[in-house]
UniProtKB/Swiss-Prot annotation:
Residues 383-601 form the Histidine kinase domain. This is Sensor protein kinase WalK. One of its GO terms (molecular function) is phosphorelay response regulator activity. It comes from the Bacteria. Keywords: ATP-binding, Cell membrane, Kinase, Membrane, Nucleotide-binding, Phosphoprotein, Transferase, Transmembrane, Transmembrane helix, Two-component regulatory system. The modification Phosphohistidine is found at H386. It comes from Staphylococcus saprophyticus subsp. saprophyticus (strain ATCC 15305 / DSM 20229 / NCIMB 8711 / NCTC 7292 / S-41). The lineage of its organism: Bacteria, Bacillati, Bacillota, Bacilli, Bacillales. The gene is walK. Residues 262-333 form the PAS domain. Pfam families: Cache_WalK, HAMP, HATPase_c, HisKA, PAS_9. Its EC number is 2.7.13.3. It is a multi-pass membrane protein.
Length: 610
């Protein structure tokens, strides 16, 4: 169907219109020319025949005016014989007033002389004395042909009609001549049309070429290519249109570049936003979602694109789009229960100037940490209040007992005062621990580091506890080579005191505390392991023992004088030394506390070099 497409092109249509206009024009001109030429030729032909008839009439009048009636017929015959060789004249007859054929120019019809002519046109000419003519078809042996019959009455000087000059003239030559002229005209028209078609293609091309270029450029623009330009062929309207089209293409290219730039910028902003973004169409179907939203919800993009936003956020049973549009409040949602992520969701509506809603946007702000901090703050306040209330209540009870007269009892009074002092010391330890944690949270706790021989440092701490705890066996596995580390001795002493004290407190039976120190020279790290044979910690609670005020067995810990802050302080101190502390425990088999710290093995002479 390629030819059909070419036939329907503007170029071909212009050529066809151009050719049709030429054909119509040539037809009109040809029709007018043919009609005019036909009239002119036939009129000329008839005028010539009329002149012949007039000459014959004049001569016949002379013959009859001379009163030579005896020789009149012979002279008329001689006169007609003179016109016998005229090409356009087929036959000339002279009929007298009695309609008797007196003479004829045609040899083959002389047998009709002295016979009566019954032609109506002859009767009309003789009876009315008027000229008449008409065209008939006659066959002279060569087929039927047009014959113009002309009747001219012959009158004497006294207006008496003496006869009729009857002429049959072959007018077919005139029409043959017209036919030849028409053929020449048709051939000329055909040649003109051929030239017109050829010129039309070139002329139409001057119009359609810029339009074709603009069409091709439009196709390229639809594909996103705005670099091509339409060639300007002149300063006419087509040229102005091409110039305007080039300007339009340039502006569209600039606008597209700006749009793409803004889109990339917007995509980059949405992608790297710390908040999750979900954008929908006007029906609430998810069309855009950024990586943060996918991470928060723990899902894949292809799993939610096209789904309803309320279904994705698990709100379809509680709200509708209309309610969200009317309600500007935010919501707290457990956006990912598996990960424990809580998000604050804010909704906004995309509205056109006409008020038509085109979509919705949901902004997911991760408030998990905030909620956890708030929860920990409430728990912290509750724990501090509880830890202070217990000794204060106990002290208040003993003071009331002393006020009631127990101070007079020599046996009870010292016991009450001893308990009051212990509770006071416990509150002082609690407040001191809280102050230390507060300083570390505010990074106002000063850490004074110095390079120490860790072997000597840890052995000194173990020796001290070993001397005071006669019922506990201490097992050491410390490398013989010297290990140096940069620490704050006082702060790290506090850490190991807390860990060792807990190990001794919770050991049972034949109490045993093991110390293992291993060095990783490749990473310049060392690991200290303190293991007891105590009651152990449930596996689901191991990670929580470093939380503030957390106790596995609250009653037992409080009975042993613990504040629940020792390991929390130890964790802060270890992390301040770029270290790490964690626990590993099997319930009923004991607990191991692991501490990693930076270290360095110094060769002999390194101290002197410094």
């Amino acid at each position: 169907m390629k030819w059909l497409k070419h036939f329907q092109s503007l170029h071909t249509k212009l050529v066809i219109v151009y050719v049709l206009l030429i054909i119509i024009g040539m037809q009109i001109i040809g029709l007018y020319f043919t009609n005019s030429l036909e009239k002119e030729l036939t009129q000329t032909f008839k005028n010539n025949i009329s002149q012949y008839a007039k000459q014959i009439e004049i001569n016949i009048e002379k013959v009859y005016d001379e009163d030579n009636a005896i020789n009149a017929q012979k002279e008329v015959q001689n006169l007609l014989n003179e016109y016998a060789n005229r090409q356009e004249i087929e036959e000339i007859r002279f009929i007298d007033k009695d309609q008797i054929i007196m003479a004829t120019s045609k040899q083959s019809t002389r047998s009709l002389i002295n016979q009566k002519a019954n032609d109506n046109s002859i009767q009309k000419a003789l009876s009315l004395g008027e000229i008449n003519s008409h065209t008939v078809l006659k066959d002279y042996g060569n087929g039927k042909q047009r014959v113009w019959v002309y009747n001219l009455p012959v009158k004497t000087s006294n207006d008496g009609t003496i006869g009729d000059v009857y002429i049959e003239a072959d007018i077919n030559d005139v029409y043959n001549q017209l036919s030849n002229i028409n053929q020449i005209f048709i051939v000329g028209t055909g040649i003109s049309l051929l030239i017109t078609v050829i010129l039309g293609f070139f002329i139409a091309r001057t119009i359609t070429k810029p339009i074709t270029d603009m069409r091709n450029q439009t196709v390229e623009m639809s594909k996103g290519n705005y670099t091509q330009r339409v060639k300007i062929y002149g300063n006419d309207e087509i040229g102005e249109l091409a110039l305007a089209f080039n300007n339009l293409s340039k502006r569209v290219q600039e606008a597209q570049a700006n749009t793409e730039s803004e889109k990339r910028r917007l995509d980059s902003v949405i992608t790297h936003m710390s908040d999750g973004i979900i954008a929908t169409d006007r029906r609430g179907r998810v069309r855009i979602v950024n990586d943060m939203a996918l991470t928060m919800m723990g899902t894949m993009k292809e799993d939610i694109i096209g789904d309803h936003m309320l279904k994705v956020l698990k709100l379809e049973e509680d709200f509708s789009l209309d309610e969200i549009q009317e309600n500007n409040d935010s919501f707290l949602l457990d956006i990912n229960e598996n990960e424990g992520i809580i998000a604050r969701v804010n909704f906004s509506t995309i509205v056109q100037e006409t008020g038509f809603v085109t979509g919705y946007i949901a902004v997911l702000h991760d408030v998990t940490e905030q909620q956890q901090v708030e929860r920990e703050r409430r728990e912290f306040v509750a724990n501090v209040s509880h830890e202070l209330r217990t000794p204060l209540t106990s002290m208040n009870s003993y003071i009331e007992a002393l006020e009631s007269g127990a101070w007079k009892d020599g046996e009870l009074a010292p016991q009450f005062l001893s308990v009051t002092r212990e509770e006071t010391e416990r509150m002082i330890r609690l407040v001191n621990d809280l102050l230390q944690l507060s300083k570390m949270d505010n990074e106002s706790e000063q850490i004074t580091k110095e390079i120490v021989d860790f072997n000597m440092f840890i052995n000194k701490i173990i020796n001290r506890h070993e001397m005071s705890a006669k019922d506990t066996t201490f097992v050491r596995e410390v490398p013989t080579e010297t290990i140096f580390t940069e620490i704050d001795p006082d702060k790290m002493t506090q850490v190991f005191d807390n860990v060792i004290t807990n190990a001794m407190k919770y050991s049972r039976g034949d109490k045993r505390v093991e110390f293992h120190v291993k060095q990783n020279a490749l990473y310049n790290r060392m690991t200290i392991r303190v293991k007891d044979n105590g009651i152990g910690i449930p596996i689901n609670k191991v990670d929580k023992i470093f939380d503030r005020f957390y106790r596995v067995d609250k009653a037992r810990t409080r009975k042993m004088g613990g504040t629940g802050l020792g390991l929390a302080i130890s964790k802060e101190i270890v992390e301040a030394h770029n270290g790490r502390i964690w626990a590993n425990s099997v319930e009923g088999q004991g607990t191991s506390i692991f501490i990693t710290l930076p270290c360095e093995v110094l060769e002999d002479g390194d101290w002197d070099a410094e």
